[in-house]
Amino acid sequence: MKLSELPRRVAATVEGVADAVPNDAIARRLRELGFVRGERVEIVAAGPVGAEPLLVQIGFTRFALRRSEAARIEVTVDSEAFA
């Protein structure tokens, strides 16, 4: 599942960041910010117009991401999210 498809307040684990093009600067920057395999992530909120931007929390840090940026991040929903 892509991070952009994750419902709000559902915990997930990052599986990886996909490069849209070779040497993708945005994907590289997302990895530098901490969107790496094994990190827990969740969408905290979404903007009022077109649900943009997404307020995403990874660890104790929050980032505002466009949906197109969040769509590059592959996640797996944590099993305890539905327990």
Indicate where each model-derived feature is located.
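Small-residue-enriched segments and motifs
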Residues: 1, 12-15, 41
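C-terminal structural segments of small proteins and small subunits
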Residues: 10-12, 48-83
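Cytosolic, membrane-proximal regulatory domains of ion/volume homeostasis and mechanosensation machinery
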Residues: 1-3, 75
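Short alpha-helix capping/helix-loop boundary micro-motifs
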Residues: 23-29
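Short, basic/aromatic beta-hairpin or loop at an interaction surface
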Residues: 8-21
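Short, surface-exposed secondary-structure edge patches
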Residues: 3, 30-34
